[in-house]
Amino acid sequence: MVEKGKRIQLNVVQKNRLFYGSLVLLALFSFLVVGSREPVLFDDSGAYTKIDPIEGVMPVYPLFLLLNQYLFGLDRYLYAVIVEQGILAAVCVILFVRTLKDEFHLHYWETYLFFFLSLMPFTTEMPQSMATQQILTEGLSYALFYLFVIVMLKAVWTKKYVWFAGSLAMTFVLAALRSQLQILFAVCSVIFLYIVCRRKQEGRKACVWIRAFIGIAGGLCICLAGIFVISRLTAGYKNLIKTNETFSVFAMKVQSPEDYETYLLSGMDAEKAAEEEAARKKEEEEDRELALKRRLSRFTTSQYVSLIFSRGMYEADSEDAYLFEDEIVRGLYVALYEAVDEEKQRYVYAQNGLWMWKDIVGGVGQVGKTCLRVPSLYYAENYPEIVLSDQYSEIRNAHLTLIGITLLKAHFGRFLYHTFMMLPQAFICTVFFQVGPIYLLCHLVTLFLYLSALALMIREFIDRKADQKCAEFMALILGSNVVMVIVISLVFFGQQRYLVYNFGAFYISYYLLLRELWNGHIRDKARKWRKA
């Protein structure tokens, strides 16, 4: 620190300490004070606060909550969770903007701007709450996604495989936290192709074709292997819950103390448990009706079965019953169709126009809930031997998968049309807001943002004097946005919180491209024009 006259001048190190200290305070204030100062629970939150093999729930967040329940108790753990999520978000956002500041030599005011833009994904439920104050996976995934972007940018900028390996590791973490983020394996595949093709190596230019082949083949293997590993991880997690008594008892002790007390008082050892299980089976054999009632809810399904079935059932028509030759499946389809049609969750009830996507998302999203018990009741009434079979879950899933795939094949054109109708709103979610009175204008603004960003990116790639890192940054954001929008619209049913991960990063990369354009061309031309 140097005192010059009456003014105190700070050196670079002191300025940086003061600057990053202010960012820490701003981040903690934003994540812990702004919005709600209480934990915010949603309908989905219950799926994470209990250790259960629930469809679509990945292992990381329930285990994270279980650890906090164990450390802080059921009365205080939610407050600990939102503090931990807030601190993690603060660390990740500051690391992200610091990476950009160091790479692009940003002014302090520019870094502040980038910091506030980076907060945008966390504000989808404002003014009620920040994402870090919610007991949902987004409390962790939005923050960790910035670490993914950091290592992915390093991989793209340096063309080094060690950074790519880091981005792949972050993808595994994110996919184990949120199932939809398996999409990022596709992004990693594209980045791998880019690195292989652009990496400087000794050899002839003709080897570019060989590199492209290696990149495509390697990217495909990475994508498929990643999805396979995550599926096995999820299956292992569910198997742990169902079969590992030590883990189940520990979870019961932490999450349900009353049930644990009952368990201890029962003094149930393995021999007694086996005797009671044998007695229960004998009772079921003697009382068929009792057996049916007990087994009706004993089924498991996968997220993929539900997605295929829901997307297909939304496209259903009454005459589609004739598509199924099997009498059991045909009867099941009729029962499912009647349930869905009664709730007006088919495509025929969707409004036309720009808001059609809302009815599509609502219909597809509710079909699974509407039809959850229909197969069980149908089997119990008409084919009770299926319910009593040890393969009940497998038979149920096979029938639902067959129905979903058959309907999608029969109405594939309509399915693509409805998917296409969801794309515009999905793209809007990635970079802009959906405002009812000016909804058409929202489409036009989004189109302008994407086209202008694409034009600026291409110009940077063409101009060899320009810093191509800005263009590579935008290419990563646009590419991941396109992959997310298409896959989520095709496979899942788009929700805003699935699509806003790159919201702030898009405007940051857009600003960097504009800055590069100004510094490289417009400013010099403006100076020459003034002199003239």
Regions found by a protein language model. Give the residues of each.
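Extracytoplasmic catalytic/substrate-binding loops of multi-pass membrane glycan-assembly enzymes
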Residues: 34-49, 53-76, 393-397, 412, ...
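Juxtamembrane membrane-water interface segments immediately following transmembrane helices
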Residues: 41, 47, 212-385
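Aromatic- and kink-enriched transmembrane "portal" helix at the membrane-lumen/periplasm boundary
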Residues: 59-62, 78, 82, 115-141, ...
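Membrane-interface anchor segments at the N-terminal boundary of transmembrane helices
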Residues: 76-88, 387-482
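Transmembrane-helix motifs of polytopic, lipid-linked glycan transferases
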Residues: 83-106, 143-151, 452-455
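Transmembrane-helix signature of polytopic, membrane-embedded enzymes
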Residues: 96-124, 142, 162
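Membrane-interface transmembrane helices that cradle and orient dolichyl/undecaprenyl
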Residues: 146-163
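Membrane-interface alpha helices of multi-pass inner-membrane proteins
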Residues: 164-178, 219-227
